[in-house]
Amino acid sequence: MSKTTIIERIWPAKEIIEDLSELRKQSPLTHVITNIVVTNWTANVLLAIGSSPAMVIAKEEAGEFAKIASGLLINIGTVTSNDAITMKIAAEAAHQAKIPWVLDPVAVGALGFRTELAKELLNFKPTVIRGNASEILALAGTDGGGKGVDSTALSSDALPLAQMLAEKTGAVIAISGEIDYVTNGKETISISGGDPIMTKVTGVGCSLGGVIASFLGVQKDPLRATATASAVFAIAGTRSAKISKGSGSFAVNFLDQLNLLSTEK
């Protein structure tokens, strides 16, 4: 059981509309270091919401660019030894420059190299850690029961340890699942919506990390920014599923629905 009161946030809550409107006005420069499977998709998702993605991955440039971006995503999904160097350089630079950044510890706990890397990256104080229940449980030091990038645990099961992890690291923890939870250890927000078909399109979950990084660039409260990103994803997923025949049409419709979200009151 959660040790805090859980507040639900769904579209079109006032905070969500305000944050999305501000993002579209500012078009924050978002530094994305992600896995090779989802790079193109993530860029398209960020463009659809109104952000400005930049996939700068050379170790010679990553630190310099991280310092001028509005936000940074580091996703370790297909990490290599060279990628790990880039990620540590970028994370350290963002931390030093006080640039908010998101860690997506894909499949952490399942394999040793990425698990050790994720723990090293925690030294650079991520603003937000986003993952499924198994990944969050593994990062918190327990057996998450994951199978690769997939989770066999419920988001609600991971919430108590997510709250402890938030207090330990100082990061906001975002758990993706049938119901998403966002917590800073003291406050917890739940976001319902979306659709199971979202798990049938490669990169949907990973791109959420980029959306969170984008909202961090315009909303200084990381709990609110992360909840807004999750709520935007949920409503776009719900609307897209209703008009899609399968995963292929869903992918296109999802980009459209993100782009078409209205901020008019």
Curated annotation (Swiss-Prot):
Is-annotated flag, keyword Manganese? no
EC id: 2.7.1.50
Explain the purpose of this protein. Catalyzes the phosphorylation of the hydroxyl group of 4-methyl-5-beta-hydroxyethylthiazole (THZ).
**Lineage start:** Bacteria, Pseudomonadati, Spirochaetota, Spirochaetia, Leptospirales
Which pathway does it take part in? Cofactor biosynthesis; thiamine diphosphate biosynthesis; 4-methyl-5-(2-phosphoethyl)-thiazole from 5-(2-hydroxyethyl)-4-methylthiazole: step 1/1
Question: Which CDD domains does the UniProt entry name for this protein?
Answer: THZ_kinase (cd01170)
Which cofactor is essential here? Mg(2+)
Question: Residues that bind ATP, according to the entry?
Answer: R130, S176
Protein name as it appears in the record: Hydroxyethylthiazole kinase
Q: Which organism is it from?
A: Leptospira interrogans serogroup Icterohaemorrhagiae serovar copenhageni (strain Fiocruz L1-130)
